[in-house]
């Protein structure tokens, strides 16, 4: 052991009780090297640093996940602290630590350094475990503990060691100011220097559906020397791509899963049609068109419209959308010094809300479209229409684009016997449909609130107008549109919703970039990506015109692949891949793709064929059809990743060919969807939990029933209406709200029969009798 080290250790030996003959030399050495901070027996006064709490917003410390600091094992040099002083008595040390924990002064000082009650408790538990479980402690803390045992030091002298340990398990304490600066989102216009370097002309084309607003913007786009169209859907991007090239204007297509070039040798065309997330904000254009600008408020995707609005480098930027976005867009562009020219349009064809509901599917006429908000309602209505000897086309969100277009062509074809359309709100944009009358099967739509909880609420005015506006389109066979509801008692509510003014949009969405997350990870290297996102959102500073978009889907993917060794940038890209987290096969495919990538094993066409067990057979029931839709989504995922990691996903052209084959198989299944529903019901593979509206399909029963609002997806076959208006009001509400399923209700009924035979026999018997018509 070196002499300086010996001097330092001897200088820290206790000068009080038990020091014996070594007290004098110890005092002399302390005079040379100085005493340990805090040896005066009071709370040490440490210099404030960036780790001290500060800033305008206190962080949500529940997001700080403590790291693990392992206790020290046996040292090769032995327990030097014990050699120079004495071995520590664990019982005495525990008493000292407990006393330290209970000190109000220590808790207050900890709070000054960002350790609130929760963090203080967690840090202390870790600190205590570290000290109690270590074979040998660092010499300095060993000596201080020994000094405290002999009353030569104060218990508060442990604070520097405690704070050091707290910063080890909560590294965010060291860099809060840096993190706040990184997550400062208060000046988004400054992120786009190319756009700020020019004076853009902004034209807002405002009007309802079928007013020609997008048409006028596209005409300017086609006449420009260069242009970019940014749409919300792949279908819309494809439509403009085809229209542009048909008009003799060379146009490329860019979506997340597809790139199409029309110029020879892959040369970039003067025009490009893309989904809004894919627009290039560094490329200069003469004209840019941003469609459906009101989606800037979308909780998940709004950031893409904000980025396009503020960042597109175009001499003219044409915005198409609802008037509700005018004020916000004007305010946002005021900060860039750009003025907004507003051009308002009126609907080209009249539309009227009928005074009578449909009430019965027997009253359907050619050109009718029944809008449902769940697949189960789609299946049930389609089956009821088929029973009446009518053909219907079916469109819902999870269908592949090719299948949607095929069903739209079938419905629009005047020579096709299919004259009825059953669809979800997926028809609200992206499809040209010849609809005469929109019939709302229900006005209740499931939605996800800010807390990620499922809610059943009436559709908004904006949603109702978007869907209703599909009736009587200018380019369709029907020059006048009509709107009504399936059920009589929904009609008044529909009129009320449609007559409400659309609430002005208050804020635009923002999203952290990969670079910002990388900087966070630099400061918090041991933190998971999901936790990094939580901390970023918590630290983010935005002004009243913006909000941070919901990142639950991103976090879901991050947690799914967290255990797979990937670089942060690669992990970030995988997490931004658009997947349906409700599809187990798609989620497991993302996991498998990430695992293959981490092993540096390319995902070849042959590997993918084996993985999905190609060839796939035509669907025999609804479950088979849903499985095929999931495989189609897996192909989309592969293609999306192939444009980000070309070497690891090398066979995009083969996969695209395979996807087209699958699209044909799915189209065949959807064409025969009523047969699939019938087979599924007969084999008990499809159990449809009726919503209140579904359970009262006209013709299903002769007795009228009370309307139960809501669209509830579940696992029970469609039932005839209740025979009594007063029966089971509470149970109906609970099922409607998603708090009970039909199976749970059955079980409760059985328990009521067992536990309260006298009280429950009559009512339960009535319920059971009601379900007899559907029993096998």
UniProtKB/Swiss-Prot annotation:
The keyword Hydrolase applies. The modification N6-acetyllysine is found at residue 99. Residues 766-776 have a biased composition (Basic residues). Residues 689-733, 751-776 are annotated as: Disordered. It is found in: Nucleus; Mitochondrion matrix; Mitochondrion matrix, Mitochondrion nucleoid. One of its GO terms (biological process) is mitochondrial RNA 3'-end processing. Residues 1-40 form a transit peptide. The modification Phosphoserine is found at residue 722. Residues 650-776 are annotated as: Interaction with LAMTOR5, important for protein stability. It is an enzyme of class 3 (hydrolase). GO terms for molecular function: 3'-5' RNA helicase activity; ATP binding; ATP hydrolysis activity; DNA binding; DNA helicase activity; double-stranded RNA binding; identical protein binding; protein homodimerization activity. CDD domains: DEXQc_Suv3, SF2_C_suv3. Residues 194-334 form the Helicase ATP-binding domain. It catalyses: ATP + H2O = ADP + phosphate + H(+). Keywords: Acetylation, ATP-binding, Helicase, Hydrolase, Mitochondrion, Mitochondrion nucleoid, Nucleotide-binding, Nucleus, Phosphoprotein, Transit peptide. It comes from the Eukaryota. Major helicase player in mitochondrial RNA metabolism. Component of the mitochondrial degradosome (mtEXO) complex, that degrades 3' overhang double-stranded RNA with a 3'-to-5' directionality in an ATP-dependent manner. Involved in the degradation of non-coding mitochondrial transcripts (MT-ncRNA) and tRNA-like molecules. ATPase and ATP-dependent multisubstrate helicase, able to unwind double-stranded (ds) DNA and RNA, and RNA/DNA heteroduplexes in the 5'-to-3' direction. This is ATP-dependent RNA helicase SUPV3L1, mitochondrial. The lineage of its organism: Eukaryota, Metazoa, Chordata, Craniata, Vertebrata.
């Amino acid at each position: 052991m070196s002499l300086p080290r010996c001097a330092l250790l001897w200088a820290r030996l206790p000068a009080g009780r038990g020091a014996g003959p070594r007290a004098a030399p110890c005092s002399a050495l302390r005079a040379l090297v100085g005493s340990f901070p805090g040896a005066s027996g009071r709370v040490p006064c440490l210099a404030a640093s960036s780790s001290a709490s500060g800033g305008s917003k206190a962080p949500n410390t529940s997001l700080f996940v403590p790291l693990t600091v392992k206790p020290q094992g046996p040292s090769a040099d032995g327990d030097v602290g014990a050699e120079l002083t004495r071995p520590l008595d664990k019982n005495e040390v525990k008493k000292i630590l407990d006393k330290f924990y209970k000190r109000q002064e220590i808790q207050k000082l900890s709070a000054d350094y960002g350790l609130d009650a929760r963090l203080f408790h967690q840090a202390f538990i870790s600190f205590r475990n570290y000290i109690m479980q270590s074979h040998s402690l660092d010499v300095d803390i060993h000596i201080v503990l020994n000094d405290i045992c002999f009353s030569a030091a104060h218990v508060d002298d442990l604070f520097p060691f405690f704070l050091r340990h707290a910063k080890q398990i909560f590294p965010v304490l060291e860099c809060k100011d840096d993190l706040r600066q990184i997550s400062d989102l208060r000046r988004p216009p400054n992120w786009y220097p190319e756009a700020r370097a020019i004076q853009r002309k902004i034209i807002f084309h405002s009007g309802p559906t079928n007013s020609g607003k997008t048409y006028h913007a596209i005409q300017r786009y086609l006449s420009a020397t260069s242009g970019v169209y940014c749409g919300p859907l792949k279908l819309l991007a494809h439509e403009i791509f085809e229209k542009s090239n048909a008009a003799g204007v060379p146009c490329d297509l860019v979506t997340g899963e597809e790139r199409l070039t029309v110029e020879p040798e892959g040369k970039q065309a003067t025009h490009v049609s893309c989904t809004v997330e894919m627009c290039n904000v560094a490329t200069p254009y003469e004209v840019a068109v941003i469609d459906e600008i009101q989606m800037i408020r979308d909780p998940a995707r709004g950031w893409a419209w904000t980025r396009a609005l503020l960042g597109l480098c175009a001499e003219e930027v044409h915005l198409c959308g609802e008037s509700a976005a005018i004020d916000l867009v004007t305010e946002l562009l005021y900060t860039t010094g750009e003025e907004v020219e507003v051009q308002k349009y009126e609907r080209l064809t009249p539309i009227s809300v009928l005074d009578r509901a449909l009430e019965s599917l027997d009253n359907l006429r050619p050109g009718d479209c029944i809008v449902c908000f769940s697949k189960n309602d789609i299946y049930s209505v389609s089956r009821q229409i088929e029973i009446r000897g009518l053909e219907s086309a079916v469109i819902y969100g999870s269908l592949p684009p090719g299948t949607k277009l095929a069903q739209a062509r079938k419905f629009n074809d005047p020579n096709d016997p299919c004259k009825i359309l059953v669809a979800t709100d997926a028809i609200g944009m992206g499809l040209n449909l010849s609809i005469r009358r929109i019939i709302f099967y229900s006005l209740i739509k499931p939605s996800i609130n800010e807390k990620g909880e499922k809610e059943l609420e009436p559709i908004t005015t904006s949603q109702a107008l978007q869907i209703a506006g599909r009736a009587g389109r200018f380019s369709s066979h029907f020059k006048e549109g009509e709107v009504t509801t399936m059920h009589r008692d929904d009609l008044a509510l529909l009129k009320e919703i449609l007559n409400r003014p659309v609430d002005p949009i208050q804020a635009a969405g923002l999203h952290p970039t990969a670079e910002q997350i990388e900087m966070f990870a630099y400061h918090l290297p041991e933190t998971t990506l999901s936790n990094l996102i939580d901390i970023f959102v918590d630290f983010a500073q935005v002004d009243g015109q913006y909000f941070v978009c919901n990142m639950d889907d991103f976090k879901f993917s991050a947690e799914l692949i967290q255990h797979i060794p990937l670089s942060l940038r690669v992990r970030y890209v995988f997490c931004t891949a658009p997947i349906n987290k409700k599809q187990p096969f798609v989620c497991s495919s993302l996991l498998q793709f990430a695992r293959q990538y981490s092993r540096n094993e390319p995902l070849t066409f042959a590997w993918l064929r084996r993985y999905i067990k190609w060839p796939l057979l035509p669907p025999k029931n609804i479950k088979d059809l849903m499985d095929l839709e999931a495989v189609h989504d897996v192909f989309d995922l592969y293609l999306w990743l192939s444009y980000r990691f070309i070497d690891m996903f090398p066979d995009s052209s083969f996969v695209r060919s395979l996807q087209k084959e699958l699209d044909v198989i799915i189209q065949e299944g959807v064409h025969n969807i009523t047969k699939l529903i019938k087979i599924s019901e007969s084999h008990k593979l499809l159990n449809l939990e009726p919503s209140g509206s579904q359970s009262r399909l006209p013709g299903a029963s002769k007795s009228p029933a009370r309307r139960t609002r809501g669209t509830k997806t579940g696992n029970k076959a469609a039932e005839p209406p209740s025979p009594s208006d007063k029966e089971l009001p509470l149970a109906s509400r609970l099922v409607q709200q998603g708090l009970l399923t039909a199976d749970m209700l059955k079980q409760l009924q059985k328990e009521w029969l067992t536990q309260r035979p006298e009280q429950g026999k009559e009512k339960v018997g009535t319920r059971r009798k009601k379900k007899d018509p559907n029993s096998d």
